[in-house]
Regions:
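FIC/Doc superfamily catalytic core
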Residues: 1-250, 254-372
Length: 372
């Protein structure tokens, strides 16, 4: 709760804005000096309205920077995971201060996500074509299939915005049914009942008689891991396992990427875009994942988040620092913010340098310097 107190010092009235926050099991009271009074009731209410957001923001920062990760199972160094978590939280709490920008940025992420996810599967529509279909229902493309591959996401987004549950078989079938509408109505929302092979790989997907059991086992695995595993690693592992099962005749890639994003968004991460230009790296990471090595895929996905989805953090960092200086936040917050943005830039440089050599994406390179 944010409240105003006044102190009397040598006959003069001084006003302070206070807010209590719990950190590491202890209560810390934040106090911002408002000025020398007396103030009228109207002035007090105006100050409370004007300044409350910033003291609440300070409390959020203190929570972020005091948080200790307690993931029991992780593949990447905790120091690396900590930066992802910090960027996620900073991205989240910055949104109300730049509402219009964030809304447009999220719309752009959704558009590029749809274009990338369908292009990976062979859709030839341009980004502009996809935009016309999603935003204006304007027909575009060489075939009806290509148009519906894009248009179906509009219905899917509407459903997912209202969905409050977690991953289950019903949700997976609903996602597939929606994405395959008017494309393959006979098999939309139905698990495959035939065995298949995947061209270009040595991997054999799950035999059809045990697909439902394998999907249910995957869901149970997810439920057992979701509180103990970093969200990015959890999302990548779920995606990999789902692709290996390959439960549908067609549409497995699109469903797997939607489920990956569902896990990220449910954990307050922004949407992830895998652009068509990264298709080769993405598919190679999945191939490596088939051998049991998930690290290249996790580093690849982390790199996309840092490079693209967390772009608002870099865009508004200086503005945020200016607000903090103006409000006389503690030097600890300013220092931690500087450390975080420097780590962000350092990780981005490391990952960009590694991606061109996908076969060598490994922890020994990621652990350069402090990433241990």
């Amino acid at each position: 709760m944010v409240y105003i107190i006044k102190k009397m010092v040598k006959g003069e009235i001084y006003y302070y804005l206070n807010h209590s926050v719990r950190l590491d099991g202890k209560v810390k009271t934040l106090s911002h000096y408002l000025g020398k009074g007396p103030f009228t009731q109207y002035e007090i209410e105006s100050l409370l309205k004007e300044k409350s957001q910033m003291i609440l923001l300070e409390a959020e920062f203190l929570k972020i920077f005091s948080r200790k990760l307690n993931y029991k199972e992780h593949l990447l160094p905790l120091s690396f995971i900590n930066i992802l978590e910090r960027l996620k939280e900073i991205n989240r709490i910055m949104a109300p201060f730049n509402k219009s920008y964030f809304e447009k940025f999220e719309d752009n992420l959704r558009l590029r996500y749809v274009h990338g996810s369908t292009a990976i599967e062979g859709n030839t529509l341009s980004l502009r074509d996809a935009q016309l279909i999603l935003e204006e229902d304007t027909p575009a493309g060489n075939t009806l299939r290509e148009m519906y591959e894009i248009l179906n996401y509009k219905e899917l987004f509407k459903f997912m915005r209202s969905y409050t549950g977690d991953i289950n078989l019903k949700l997976i079938l609903k996602i597939h049914e929606t994405l395959m509408k008017n494309i393959d109505d006979e098999n939309a929302g139905a698990l495959r009942n035939i065995d298949i092979s995947i061209s270009g790989t040595d991997y054999d997907p799950t035999p059809s008689p045990v697909i439902e059991d394998e999907i249910n086992s995957l869901i149970d695995w997810y439920k057992g891991k979701k509180h103990f595993t970093p969200p990015v690693e959890l999302a990548c592992a779920f995606h990999q396992k789902f692709v290996e099962i390959h439960p549908f005749i067609d549409g497995n890639g699109r469903v797997s990427r939607e489920l990956l994003n569902f896990i990220l968004i449910k954990n307050n991460y922004p949407r992830l875009v895998i652009p068509f230009e990264r298709r080769g790296v993405y598919l190679r990471c999945i191939d490596i994942g088939n051998t049991g090595d998930l690290i290249p895929f996790i580093i690849f996905i982390s790199g996309l988040l840092i490079e693209d989805s967390f772009k608002p953090v870099a865009t508004f960092f200086e503005q945020l620092k200016s607000k903090i200086i103006d409000e006389n936040y503690s030097s600890e917050i300013s220092l931690e913010l500087d450390n975080t943005i420097n780590d962000y830039k350092e990780i981005l440089d490391i990952i960009k340098g590694m991606e061109g050599r996908i076969e060598k994406l490994n922890l020994s390179e990621l652990r350069k310097g402090k990433w241990k």
